[in-house]
């Protein structure tokens, strides 16, 4: 290895804070969510009462559905899930899914039905074969679908993205239908609901969309459909607006916590992104019962952001090593190990973890021990990356991912979400499984790492950073940065296939475990698809406005 380059001296670390970097723009939201309430707040009690009535009305519709009317039943389940209502009907939907899976007596020549059935079952954990699409292939390599049957074309395109390795028929379906949908889009009225659906799918296939954002965007489209169910539509609007009220209360709480953290710790150099971090984590745990998960996740993400900025940008190597030594002690007595500017943050971090235990109560406070273990491992890996940086060491891609797929925080995030869940199916065994960093979680971690690196490498190459996976791939294969980024995008695509295959093979775990990992993947894809939206958060402003500021008109 090369000898370590000269780094910033920590001589004055106890006397002054690290200087703020001009890289990070200030918060776009300031104190907005400390005081904001959506205009629907005064009607909350009436909204809840009406929503309860509608939920039971829709439940009757769902209970009246049978596989004898398969197209209608499949479409109803898909609609409820897209509108963000699936959570309320898990038992009814699970029963119907089993019947749909077991019933092979359906019209296998109906491309729309075949596509929707395949999509629905694979999305919900059924390993159905893809050869159901072979009969639709033409001699020219395309798929038989009448030019006017645009709905079937779109359904096939979205279904094909639930693909596994080696499923050539789905590879071909994607390439064939994408071209036809792109051509179709040019002939549709841009503002028509179907044009919006096609455009959304070409940008992000249905399976990869963030659930709560999809609900917000799909409700106005569903409202225009001739076959809409009025009770379902009204419930979807009320449900979203009620969730928005909860989200704003949680944002107020998290914003107040963050402001106190920064004011007392005086760490003004870190990225001020608590609203964006809540938005990101909300995308993984948006269902109504997961309020505590959203709060824990947001605070953990805030803590990780501070630690990451200390290690990656502002702290000296010596200071970061001192922090790592103190971190695992989880005790105020360890502050003597720290430079002055880290001491207040360390105390506030301990108080935050204690607040998690208090919120969980005696029966579930044990979960915080697992969360602490995940965070200890994260900081340990940060120190390894600092050593690589100081030694100018560029690992191979495989060696890098052995560390960085975990140091991206995959375990800390999954354990944070599981910790806050009221679901008693989350047990000690669930946490022990997650902390063992099984292949499914490792693949998710690699996905997050690669997604982050491919959009942040060019920005970070001008600073004193550890080499990214992009740099590792460039050196290992002797190619340009642009070529390496294209290859990494292929690896990201492969990660979706890997995660699907691995999730279908999982046994003995609560259903929420793989669901959560996919929801994390979706919200991460939304954050990093075209840009690093956490660091440069202007791209998120409109989405945040839609989710947390603007109610859906009734």
Swiss-Prot record:
It is found in: Cytoplasm. Its cofactor is Mg(2+); Mn(2+). The keyword rRNA-binding does not apply. The allele found in cv. B73 encodes an inactive enzyme while the two alleles found in cv. Delprim encode an active (TPS5A) and an inactive (TPS5B) enzyme. GO terms for cellular component: cytoplasm. One of its GO terms (molecular function) is terpene synthase activity. Belongs to the terpene synthase family. Disulfide bonds: none annotated. Monomer. Non-functional sesquiterpene synthase having less than 1% of the activity found in TPS5A. The keyword Transferase does not apply. Keywords: Cytoplasm, Magnesium, Manganese, Metal-binding. Mg(2+) 1 binds at residues 308, 312. One of its GO terms (biological process) is diterpenoid biosynthetic process. A motif (DDXXD motif) lies at residues 308-312. SUPFAM superfamilies: Terpenoid cyclases/Protein prenyltransferases, Terpenoid synthases. Pathway: Secondary metabolite biosynthesis; terpenoid biosynthesis. This is Inactive sesquithujene synthase B. The gene is TPS5B. Binds 3 Mg(2+) or Mn(2+) ions per subunit. Mg(2+) 3 binds at residues 452, 456, 460. Substrate binds at residues 308, 312, 449, 452. Pfam families: Terpene_synth, Terpene_synth_C. The lineage of its organism: Eukaryota, Viridiplantae, Streptophyta, Embryophyta, Tracheophyta. The Asp-Asp-Xaa-Xaa-Asp/Glu (DDXXD/E) motif is important for the catalytic activity, presumably through binding to Mg(2+). Its main location: cytoplasm. Mg(2+) 2 binds at residues 308, 312. Transmembrane segments: none annotated.
